[in-house]
């Protein structure tokens, strides 16, 4: 069964020195800090041949492959792949010209087989007709189950075959397969090798395959043995065995390793057992196997690209962004429980804030010591007026009342003297009275001040009750009991609003921001851990395209969350909105996008879920406390207030309050400043995340 191979799409013909090889590595070094993974490595992959790359775990095979496909930069040396350096502007490596199958499979478990292949076909720009033809061929060739089968439900061998199918999908000119036949049925393994041999016969497809089945590598045209970041041997399998008088390839490689250890050679040994120079020149023996390319030193071709090509290479491709966007939305669709939870969580949170924050305390027990016994006394009239829904009066003796407060049973004590009524009348009528009369005509209050909100509420209720009591007793002369300070009607807002009115706008922004952080903080971490990011990089996806796709997909989620929150706070809890609803929505959406951007920074910078979660939670409380969401910024001491004003939500919270409660628009500085600060932080986080992601790839 055959499939047409994709034609090379190079902008210029291969240089003369490079036209006979697919990959040429010269003096390649790669280090991670002080650890040298690749040390002056030289490797040549002939055009149109299968190259078996063998070596123990940790010898540098995966690092070398990442350098070849352009997702990892080399510290020193030169690499050319299909005539040009990897990641060269206009060169589709990484991109459509390379098919990559990583060892860890790197598949989306929520996808079906068809979803997986369609996703990569969108990345590579295949037409729908081409995609269907290739999909049908690969499903039949790789003996895969029905294309609607979920990857999560497949066996390990079936998943490996799906991963191989994704690598073969676009008929690449270069195939890099990392352990493609592990866990695969022997019959199917033979069939896969037969297909690989068949597609290289045209001379247009070159294959690098790594395997720990050493004898299986005998089917390759050329084998190379890596150890400690060096290439010990590179020749046809039969040549290697003959030169070491071995009947098996495994035994020949064992001899090479022993020889390398004995000689202490760090740059490897040739198949003949001698030390290798940097050129690592080997003799080719056509009668012993397929010809090997000359390892004589060649001049590295200088590739140049004009500014138009570089600009085109840097600009994000809408096709790839759309593919990544559809991928993310499809994964969300396949997890309906998680999606519903994401939609309901902000509604639950804002409902709890509106219901539980800012209201008056209820059922506060207060001990009452009333030494007046007359039913018509002023003390009984005043106590009758006191708000009984908030304050529960418990009549007690003086000693019992204070004992109860000391035990924590009551929040305070109200005390009335036995002559409270007569002394209060004297205070109102007589011009001069003694201190004893003033004291006896006063309500004595002892409060537990450990809870400031309850203590302030008790004082407020007592003052309101006394004002009502005085008005009832003085009639038209009630103004005598008024304070000389008169609070007029508010310019903005109303006098009967509670603390929840202050908290709610900031809470909406905070919930939107941190739910967006939570949505994205683990996205790159999990995809990097599962190898999905690396596979996308090799397919030609850039960091900018990845960022934009995540941004757009998460924007859909937070848009639904914002709509549900606004419905609840405006229609259910009747929060006032005197300004433009579009400005309210715009500011909340911008805060959500800023949260997404910050989550992407965390996800790009962190390597594991625990670190990402700690980073997200670590900034939650400082930002909540310092941003003026639960307490005014004016209460923050000045050295710390400068930090508060620099945070993303401080000015934004103030701007949202101005829009909702004052009805202000963008002409007011307090409003447009909130938008400007939010936009600035959003741009900063996006650029930072893109830079971090690019540096880490």
Residue ranges and their predicted role:
Residues 175-178:
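Catalytic Walker B motif of ABC-type/P-loop ATPase nucleotide-binding domains
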Residues 187, 206, 278-501, 666, ...:
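Extracytoplasmic/periplasmic domains immediately adjacent to an N-terminal transmembrane anchor
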Residues 243, 341, 348-359, 370-375, ...:
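Membrane-spanning alpha-helical segments of multipass transporters and channels
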Residues 69:
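Helix-to-loop junction immediately C-terminal to a conserved catalytic motif
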Residues 118, 122, 130-146:
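Conserved ABC ATPase "signature" region
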